[in-house]
Amino acid sequence: TLAFGFDQTSIIFFGIAGNVVAGLGAAIAGRLDDILGSRTIIIASLIGLIIAGTGVFIFADQGQITYWIGGLILCLFVGPAQSSSRTFVSRFAPAGREGEVFGMYQLTGRALSFLSGLMWSASISLSFVFGVTSNNTVWGIWGLMLILLVGLILLLRIDPNPKINFTK
């Protein structure tokens, strides 16, 4: 069967469109990052991702148009979340220790990357527990939304102007 009703050609076109939209989102958010701050952009992006992901789930039965519109809205918020996250980390990094801080940032991301696949699969498995017999793949969205929600909650606890003392 086709995932989300996309054949191979549709996936390629969606991938191209998604990257263009994510790039536009990152460019626009880059300007706003300087005005509003990285934390604000990341929070707005996470909220946008959660709302768009929920919309994709709710309107999944509308077919491929849902995945095109909802997916591109998701892409619009992915770019800013990624770019502003790097800016946010750079503002925390003390002079001369940027390599260490970004190394830890990258290590943490790689160490936790298994969570998305795990939560995707667990959510799909949960759909069977609820007796869903068709379009189970869409349920994977809930696992990803949960990860984003946890990230949002953790980010809200971070002081936007930390007083970090990195002494050796």
List PLM regions with ranges.
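Loop-to-transmembrane helix entry/capping segments in MFS-fold secondary transporters
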Residues: 8-9, 95-105
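Short amphipathic helix-loop junctions that connect adjacent transmembrane helices
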Residues: 1-11
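Multi-pass alpha-helical transporter architecture, strongest
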Residues: 142-168
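Hydrophobic core of transmembrane alpha-helices in multi-pass small-molecule transporters
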Residues: 65-80
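Helix-to-loop junctions at the C-terminal end of transmembrane segments
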Residues: 24-38, 124
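A membrane-interface helix-boundary motif in multi-pass transporters
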Residues: 122-148
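Intracellular juxtamembrane helix-capping segments at the cytosolic ends
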Residues: 80-94
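C-terminal ends and interior cores of transmembrane alpha-helices
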Residues: 47-62
